[in-house]
Design a protein with these regions (language model features):
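A feature for loop-to-transmembrane-helix boundaries and adjacent hydrophobic helices
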Residues: 18-20, 25-305
């Protein structure tokens, strides 16, 4: 979740999207505009409020862990359910800490350097807002590495099996971004433009969250899942490399139709965003991992290193 693109998500009717026809000038065409009016609250029970965003994190972690277990079982690696659960917990902790610190370092424009207590305690009791995928990825990888060291498991095989299911978690997270009405795109006259209202104004915009859910989530998962079902798995580092390279390319391209963070704007040339800048190292890292996998051709295995 990244402030600066958040619209009014505290008000509005129950979960729904209104579709209406807006009249065009005479001789023109009719344009379907989707009006965003989704409630970020999934349900409430007394003082407890559950948000779609939190549910996306929880269900996404469980899905990724399930796919990881099934994948390594198909590869005959020998991870136990306890191994997988330990890795998932470590990755989630690393992801949350890394995602928050990544936002603080790259997207807050120095705000938290003068308000350090708000990094993990929120602002005036208003809760914590602001997560960075790139920071979350780094934190998740470090958390997974520590878990592998503790369990004496091969980090690359764990990463390969894990990242087959990670796109499913990404898909849910981007859908939650859409429900929250945040991270919206630039104005568009395409038929599926969404009017988010609030800070986004009453103009149709690219639903860039859904573009990412489709490409980073569904498409990337389909590619990795099909490759994971080969009779002989790809060599160590291949699946991680495909994910990192694929995500970096998709994120770089989607940023062209996604508004930059309001507090940062464009970094250079009137088009380069922080998301694109941070995606360039991912593209290089993904390509390097694939070259490494191709040259070493190390088979997937269980034990540390």
């Amino acid at each position: 979740m990244e402030p600066g693109r958040i619209v009014d998500t505290t008000a509005g009717p129950a979960l729904c999207v209104k579709v209406c026809l807006v009249g065009a000038p005479q001789g023109g065409t009719m344009l379907n505009e989707l009006y965003h009016s989704l409630d970020p609250v999934a349900f409430s029970a007394g003082p407890i409020t559950i948000y779609w965003y939190g549910l996306a994190y929880m269900v996404g972690a469980l899905l990724a862990g399930f796919v990881m277990y099934r994948t390594q079982k198909r590869w005959n690696i020998g991870f136990t359910p306890d191994d997988v659960m330990t890795v998932v917990i470590a990755v989630v902790f690393g992801l949350l800490i890394g995602g928050r610190l990544g936002y603080v370092l790259f997207y807050s424009n120095g705000y938290y350097f003068t308000h350090p207590l708000e990094i993990f305690f929120g602002t005036n009791g208003g809760g914590i807002s602001g997560m960075s995928f790139h920071g979350g990825l780094a934190g998740g990888l470090l958390g997974g590495l520590f878990a592998c060291r503790y369990l004496r498991l091969s980090p690359l095989t764990v990463a390969d099996a894990s990242f087959v299911g990670v796109p499913l978690a990404l898909c849910l997270g981007r859908c939650a971004n859409f429900v929250n009405g945040e991270l919206w795109g630039k104005p568009t006259d395409l038929p599926w433009g969404v009017v988010f209202g609030g800070a986004a104004g009453n103009v149709p915009r690219h639903p860039s969250q859904l573009y990412e859910a489709l490409l980073e989530g569904v498409v990337l998962f389909a590619i990795l899942y099909v490759l994971s079902r080969r009779a002989k798995p790809l060599s160590q580092g291949s699946y991680l490399g495909i994910f990192v390279l694929g995500y970096g390319i998709v994120r770089f391209l989607i940023e062209f139709v996604r508004l930059p963070d309001a507090q940062l704007g464009y970094l250079a040339g009137g088009w380069l965003t922080m998301g694109q800048l941070l995606s360039l190292p991912l593209i290089a890292l993904g390509a390097a991992l694939l070259v490494y996998a191709w040259k070493t051709r190390r088979p997937q295995h269980r034990d540390w290193l």
